[in-house]
Amino acid sequence: ETESSLGEAISEVYQAGISPFWWKITALDTEKEWQTMTATLDKYDPDVGVIILGKNAPIEQFKTWFSVARSTPHTCGFAIGRSIFWEAWEQFAEGKINKPEVSEMIAERYQQVIDIWHNI
């Protein structure tokens, strides 16, 4: 369902005469989903880039997602916000951690994601 609806949506955008420089796509779970999406992008714009969105998922999930996503020539990076900052923000808002701790926690989580990206 996801792969066909995503592919259809991408096709409709191109058929409407819109050619994005980047696509921001929620992380897909399987290689088959990425292959379908890649085939659609190749059909319309083989040079377009894809940025992966993180769905507020646990950081541990990114290793699997990045591994599959990086098998396509379109994947250029990630835009993962809540997975990096949300837990720290909640703890700060509840008074469990202070400003320096929130910054440290966010920096550590961001570094984890960068390390996963570079070590795939």
Q: Can you describe what each PLM-predicted range is?
A:
Residues 1-3, 119-120:
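Generic structural signal for short, solvent-exposed loop/turn connectors between secondary structure elements
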Residues 2-3, 9-33, 54:
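Catalytic beta/alpha-barrel core
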Residues 26-120:
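Catalytic-face loop-and-helix region of soluble metabolic enzyme cores
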